[in-house]
Amino acid sequence: MDEIESSAVNAAASELRSIIERVERLEEEKAAIANDVKDVLGEAKGRGYDTKAIKTIIRLRKKDANERLEEETILQTYMAALGME
């Protein structure tokens, strides 16, 4: 391998190492955030709130209004078909 190829390989290895280290840092941050969310939900539960309902509301708030309405309509249709309403 000549000097140019060796330099290119070293540059690629350095770039790859940098990418991997960035992903590892982000994974650590994600784990820390997940623990923070767990703590907040534990606090809510301790204050008497239903954490399952809170998680459902958070999931629904992430959707736009049309998507949420469509999901609710389908759910109501299925529940009516099963005699649950």
UniProtKB/Swiss-Prot annotation:
Recorded GO MF terms? DNA binding
Lineage top rank: taxon = Bacteria
InterPro entries (alphabetical): GapR-like, GapR-like_DNA-bd
Cystine bridges: which residues? Answer: none
Task: Report the Pfam families cross-referenced here.
Answer: GapR_DNA-bd
Q: Which family does it belong to?
A: Belongs to the UPF0335 family.
Annotated HAMAP family: UPF0335
Protein's name in the database: UPF0335 protein Oant_1161
The protein's organism comes out as Brucella anthropi (strain ATCC 49188 / DSM 6882 / CCUG 24695 / JCM 21032 / LMG 3331 / NBRC 15819 / NCTC 12168 / Alc 37)
